[in-house]
């Protein structure tokens, strides 16, 4: 069963626990600038929305990487950056339409959400349940795929 992050912006309080948990899980420090998930605030509405890599089926970042440093983790479905292969060219950051791949100057490599190899720290840390790690079927992923197939067939 494939799982995915489900984000409910209505439950987000902008506490940044997700960012802190992510940076600690990946770097051993509480530093939101090192987080692979970000909480964006829409200033005109005051709404806060956590966002991170959506682990696209057709991952442009993976296809754009000239050294094939982004690979599919078949256990989690996550697209994972292989740090020992990444050359820091940033082509994947340009290819990602959502802006969820970030260049880390300290290490000269890119980073993106890897779902913490199946146990996302952000979901564990979220006190309000705004971020949950659930069966992908519950996120509507299958319905979106069915709709896409239907529209592709209609266009053909």
What is the predicted function of each stretch?
Residues 1-7:
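N-terminal beta-strand motif that seeds the catalytic metal site of vicinal oxygen chelate
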Residues 2, 31-67, 72, 83-156:
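Flanking helices and flexible, charged tails adjoining ferredoxin-like Fe-S electron-transfer domains
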Residues 10-30, 35-42:
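A positional/architectural concept
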């Amino acid at each position: 069963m494939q799982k995915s992050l489900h984000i409910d912006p209505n439950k987000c309080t902008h506490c940044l626990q997700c960012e802190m948990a992510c940076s600690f899980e990946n770097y051993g420090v509480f530093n939101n600038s090192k987080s692979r998930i970000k909480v964006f605030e829409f200033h005109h509405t005051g709404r806060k929305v956590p966002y991170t890599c959506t682990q696209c089926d057709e991952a442009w970042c993976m296809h754009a990487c000239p050294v094939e440093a982004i690979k599919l983790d078949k256990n989690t479905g996550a697209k994972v950056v292989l740090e020992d292969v990444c050359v820091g060219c940033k082509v994947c950051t340009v290819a990602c339409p959502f802006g969820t791949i970030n260049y880390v100057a300290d290490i000269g490599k890119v980073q993106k959400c890897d779902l913490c190899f199946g146990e996302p720290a952000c979901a564990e840390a979220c006190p309000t349940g705004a971020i949950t790690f659930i069966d992908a079927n519950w996120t509507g992923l299958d319905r979106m795929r069915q709709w896409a197939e239907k529209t592709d067939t209609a266009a053909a």
